[in-house]
Amino acid sequence: MGLLRIMMPPKLQLLAVVAFAVAMLFLENQIQKLEESRSKLERAIARHEVREIEQRHTMDGPRQDATLDEEEDMVIIYNRVPKTASTSFTNIAYDLCAKNKYHVLHINTTKNNPVMSLQDQMRFVKNITSWKEMKPGFYHGHVSYLDFAKFGVKKKPIYINVIRDPIERLVSYYYFLRFGDDYRPGLRRRKQGDKKTFDECVAEGGSDCAPEKLWLQIPFFCGHSSECWNVGSRWAMDQAKYNLINEYFLVGVTEELEDFIMLLEAALPRFFRGATELYRTGKKSHLRKTTEKKLPTKQTIAKLQQSDIWKMENEFYEFALEQFQFIRAHAVREKDGDLYILAQNFFYEKIYPKSN
């Protein structure tokens, strides 16, 4: 090679180096393409093997037990917190139930009491788990979280929920009790005739707008323990956080309801197929708005935010929001201002023993 450099003119040497570099780049490119082709082939073989295994299991004959197919045996519980867009979301479930072939049932408790007696807890658990005629089922109602496992149930229902900024939720509830909403405008409300604004209520130290009224989302997630309903309990908040992470399939926020619906449709299409499109383009009959609602002033908000109860409820809300946004970030991608659900991003390979 050294002799060649001596004998070759500089221009030819440069051309030789360039030609060698181009050849190496070409080879690297071809190797990369071969690697990609090999990976695609491995994935295709893996998918084929999975299909063969599934077919073999299908050909083995019907399942020996008499239980329903898993999707047909599914039960969802939406233990809805008042004034979190719960009626708007529930009406989407009602709009889809005939088309998607599932049942929707409202859990109506006496005086809307979110805490059930022990005997009612047992009845409720037995009803939901054994009522096969109502499966697949979507149950909704203003009931605090109930741990099915402690009643000896093997297959627990899927819990979902939506929560809201605690002050916004309280303001909405305050005006709802006085003026109702556009969903049932003729219904007489409990506080109808009271024209006092939320700002005036807070300024006067009224009971309907007291910080204690903020304590609702934490106990709904905490459950049926007495400490859950002890206003300002740190234990209750910690338990609510634990349940949100470990016992709830998905918890959305009112402020991002469409994204919550989109994630449910992607993960649970048996119930929510078509829900996103219905929410975006439907006649909006499912939407519900409190009437005569006036936004609170900055002074009113600042006064409520001085409360330790608000601080805890807000901490729980921020915790739920962060978890929801984490789930969404791993499930969707944004393009041209719109969100798109990601396709399946895993596959199986190296499946043994090999099929004949």
Curated annotation (Swiss-Prot):
It is found in: Golgi apparatus membrane. N-glycosylated. Its main location: Golgi. It is a single-pass type II membrane protein. The chain crosses the membrane at residues 12-28. The keyword Zinc does not apply. Residues 24-51 form a coiled coil. Glycans are attached at N108, N127. Residues 1-11 are cytoplasmic. One of its GO terms (cellular component) is Golgi membrane. One of its GO terms (biological process) is heparan sulfate proteoglycan biosynthetic process. InterPro entries: Heparan_SO4_2-O-STrfase, P-loop_NTPase, Sulfotransferase. Residues 29-356 are lumenal. Signal peptide: none annotated. The active site is at H140, H142. Adenosine 3',5'-bisphosphate binds at K83, T84, A85, S86, T87, S88, R164, S172, Y279, S285, T290, K293. It holds the Pfam family Sulfotransfer_2. Keywords: Coiled coil, Disulfide bond, Glycoprotein, Golgi apparatus, Membrane, Signal-anchor, Transferase, Transmembrane, Transmembrane helix. GO terms for molecular function: heparan sulfate 2-sulfotransferase activity. Its EC number is 2.8.2.-. Disulfide bonds join C201-C209, C222-C228. Catalyzes the transfer of a sulfo group from 3'-phospho-5'-adenylyl sulfate (PAPS) to the 2-OH position of iduronic acid (IdoA) or glucuronic acid (GlcA) within the heparan sulfate (HS) chain and participates in HS biosynthesis. Required for metanephric development of kidney formation, suggesting that 2-O-sulfation within HS is essential for signaling between ureteric bud and metanephric mesenchyme. Homotrimer. Interacts with the C5-epimerase GLCE. Belongs to the sulfotransferase 3 family. This is Heparan sulfate 2-O-sulfotransferase 1. The gene is HS2ST1.
